[in-house]
A protein has these predicted regions:
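Hydrophobic residue at the +6 position relative to the catalytic HRD Asp in the kinase catalytic loop
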Residues: 128-133
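Conserved hydrophobic core/spine positions of the Hanks-type protein kinase catalytic domain
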Residues: 111-118
Length: 178
């Protein structure tokens, strides 16, 4: 890919696209010997989600989740003009990849339940989809910063858990996105 992008005037080499979400494109980027995630906010329509200012929401949500105590990458910089965020890169497989490869461990779900205990007390849900979680040194990290007010129908037990094993919902998603 070898493209350059800047964050607050500093240049980063884009290595590859990591993924596209509701709010932006996340790239693996490097500068010197360090690797980062560089997220470029996009303004593509999303038929199932309403946004305000996406960059402001990312910053606000990051601060909220950090205060709650959620294990996640550090937000290193926010470039308001270019609508970009620079995050710490957490190296590891996503929960999605581990489910696909039959490498899931009960401990990862137990860790998520501990995360949920912190979130629910704070009246908060996160996006429990398995692509948003990376395992590094046997610990799960929430690598998205999105959070919302708690709604029972969207909590882990009622929605997220459907995608943390090879359920019909998970397999349907794989079929539609392969």
């Amino acid at each position: 890919m070898d493209k350059e992008m800047t964050v607050n005037g500093k240049s980063y080499t884009i290595i590859k696209l990591l993924g596209k979400g509701k709010g932006g494109y996340s790239y693996l980027a490097e500068s010197g010997n360090n690797r980062y995630v560089l997220k470029q906010i996009h303004h593509e329509p999303c038929d199932y989600y309403q946004f305000g200012n996406k960059l402001e929401a990312e910053i606000r949500d990051y601060k909220k989740l950090k205060e709650i105590g959620i294990k996640m990458p550090a937000m290193l910089e926010a470039d308001v003009k270019n609508e970009r965020i620079l995050k710490e890169f957490i190296d590891g497989d996503t929960i999605y990849q581990l489910v696909l490869e039959d490498k899931m461990k009960n401990d990862y779900i137990e860790q998520l339940h501990r995360m949920c205990a912190l979130l629910y007390v704070a009246n908060t849900n996160i996006d429990y989809f398995p692509t948003n979680f990376v395992v590094h040194n046997e610990e799960i990290y929430y690598v998205d910063f999105e959070c919302n007010d708690y709604m029972e129908e969207w909590n882990f037990e009622n929605w997220g858990v459907k995608y943390w094993s090879k359920t019909p919902e998970f397999l349907q998603y794989v079929k539609e996105h392969s």
